[in-house]
Amino acid sequence: MQVLTKRYPKNCLLTVMDRYAAEVHNMEQVVMIPSLLRDVQLSGPGGQAQAEAPDLYTYFTMLKAICVDVDHGLLPREEWQAKVAGSEENGTAETEEVEDESASGELDLEAQFHLHFSSLHHILMHLTEKAQEVTRKYQEMTGQVW
């Protein structure tokens, strides 16, 4: 298990990012055969499988991909838009929307920062929990629970 070496305040974004990265790296060390996670559903509250939820393999690959961004930074904006949107139409519409918002003078940067910052904090904590759940479930499946 990877141990955190940096000391930041408990709710600092850097602490949350470090915790997430450490948990995903731990998950990668524990899960030796990721294909075992295919078609295995994550248990929800009460031990019941969540309907329409992705399987553990999907979570595993998503958590690893996000961790690469957390560890190494984001792709350049153009590459990211091409990868996610698949076309330039979405990127053009988004650029026009930002320009309209800036021109109208309604851009409250501080409020937007706090909204995105708190959302990022919440999402990273949720993803950290998912990495722990994938690791725990894999250990249960392979008899490695201790």
Curated annotation (Swiss-Prot):
One of its GO terms (cellular component) is cytosol. Mainly expressed in tissues that synthesize triglycerides. Pfam families: Spot_14. GO terms for molecular function: identical protein binding; molecular function inhibitor activity; protein homodimerization activity. Residues 94-104 have a biased composition (Acidic residues). The keyword GTP-binding does not apply. It is found in: Nucleus; Cytoplasm. Keywords: Cytoplasm, Lipid biosynthesis, Lipid metabolism, Nucleus, Transcription, Transcription regulation. Residues 83-104 are annotated as: Disordered. One of its GO terms (biological process) is regulation of lipid biosynthetic process. Its main location: nucleus. Plays a role in the regulation of lipogenesis, especially in lactating mammary gland. Important for the biosynthesis of triglycerides with medium-length fatty acid chains. May modulate lipogenesis by interacting with MID1IP1 and preventing its interaction with ACACA. May function as transcriptional coactivator. May modulate the transcription factor activity of THRB. PANTHER family: SPOT14 FAMILY MEMBER, THYROID HORMONE-INDUCIBLE HEPATIC PROTEIN. Belongs to the SPOT14 family. Homodimer. Heterodimer with MID1IP1. Interacts with THRB and PLAGL1. This is Thyroid hormone-inducible hepatic protein. The lineage of its organism: Eukaryota, Metazoa, Chordata, Craniata, Vertebrata. The gene is THRSP.
